[in-house]
Amino acid sequence: MSSSSESHLATAKTALTAVASVAAAAILARSVVQDYMPNEVHEYISHGFRRFFSYFSYQMTAVIEEFGGFEHNQVFEAAEAYLSTKISNSTRRIKVNKLEKQSNYSVTVERDEEVVDIFDGVKLSWILVCRHVDKKDFRNPRDLNSTLKSEVRSYELSFRKKFKNMVLESYLPFVVEQAASIKQKFKTLKIFTVDSYSVEWTSVTLDHPSTFRTLALDPEVKKNLVEDLDRFVQRKGFYGRVGKAWKRGYLLYGPPGTGKSSLIAAIANHLNFDIYDLDLTSLNNNAELRRLLMSTANRSILVVEDIDCSIELKDRSTDQENNDPLHKTVTLSGLLNFVDGLWSSCGNERIIVFTTNYREKLDPALLRPGRMDMHIHMSYCTPAAFKVLASNYLEIQDHILFEQIEEFIREIEVTPAEVAEQLMRSDSVDKVLQGLVEFLKAKKQIDNSKA
């Protein structure tokens, strides 16, 4: 081997030895810092280094957290939807999800994956960052980033500093607008309920077949309701002009089996709104109620079924706060503050539905004008409702027994659910309708014997 080759080899060995020594020293220093330096000091030094080097960087990073106080961060949700359309071949990891009743695959960015977007010739880099925090460290009751999750998620959007105004004034509004179209196009309806352990919303896919076409409801009531719903979603400017929160309230009342739940599903399908089914008996106090209500999304329906049984709806004049720390209750005033109080303006395009079997049991405070905008009586089955049921279940528009059946329906109280049950008893139309006649005749005899 020549002296020149030996010299190069010796130089390489020296360089490798130096690199190995530096690496070993770095590992040792890192171990010492982690083991012996307090976390506060470590964070302070790291923060100082980051601030020092940031002065020499042309880059700026916008941190977009999942929650902004009590509410979902609109920009975070928009970024999640928008970036699903920007995943390229260079992306290494993606998250794919499809529930049984979903028609489309949901594709989102996995944590620590970079997604590059170009807007007006400007390069913008997105990264999803997930930070795990112990539950015991959650101490901020005003921030859902800290109160509900053990994993805090945020997007980091990086760009050149000189494009800051463009990002804030043009790019992010563009992302929000595009995301709204994407979500509406691929939206799968969901129904949310409260997890009793964590006191947060959990959801499943809503695949309820009820529509206004199939609903056994008085035609005039149905027509008025559909017109009211369509008018509501088109009047954002109107609500802002008159100074009212963009919400609508409906009270559905009537005996069990008259289709209150089916009507709620029909409203959700008609408007493409998610449903939040709130069981007030599962909550301990007004603070939990407020936190849940503030975390509901826009374009949604809040449902409180059997409102007369859910909480002790006493008059607000006697609805005093209880200072006993063991006292657990959701009060009428706490609920009404969200329905039409100051908290009602936190959120847009929301529908509130209360149901009850006995309207007369409700506190007058719930029934006053302007609180529930429409009171919809879910009555016993009518001849018109029967014809809708016959069309849905038997696929017929007329039959020789219709006149007799309709006469019975006018004379007795029978719910649409009872009629529907009879219509499912056979595949033979004649046999089913004859069975319905016998059922109605027997029911009339029972009613007469009680008179």
Curated annotation (Swiss-Prot):
Catalytic activity, EC: 3.6.1.-
Domain of life: Eukaryota
Catalytic reaction(s) noted: ATP + H2O = ADP + phosphate + H(+)
Pfam families cross-referenced by the UniProt entry: AAA (PF00004), AAA_assoc (PF14363)
Keyword Electron transport: no
Gene Ontology molecular function: ATP binding; ATP hydrolysis activity
Positions annotated to bind ATP: G254, P255, P256, G257, T258, G259, K260, S261
Gene3D superfamilies: 6.10.280.40, P-loop containing nucleotide triphosphate hydrolases (3.40.50.300)
InterPro entries: AAA+_ATPase (IPR003593), AAA_N_dom (IPR025753), ATPase_AAA_core (IPR003959), ATPase_AAA_CS (IPR003960), Mitochondrial_chaperone_BCS1 (IPR050747), P-loop_NTPase (IPR027417)
SMART domains linked: AAA
Similarity section: Belongs to the AAA ATPase family. BCS1 subfamily.
Stated name of the protein: AAA-ATPase At3g50940
Naturally occurring in which organism (per UniProt): Arabidopsis thaliana (Mouse-ear cress)
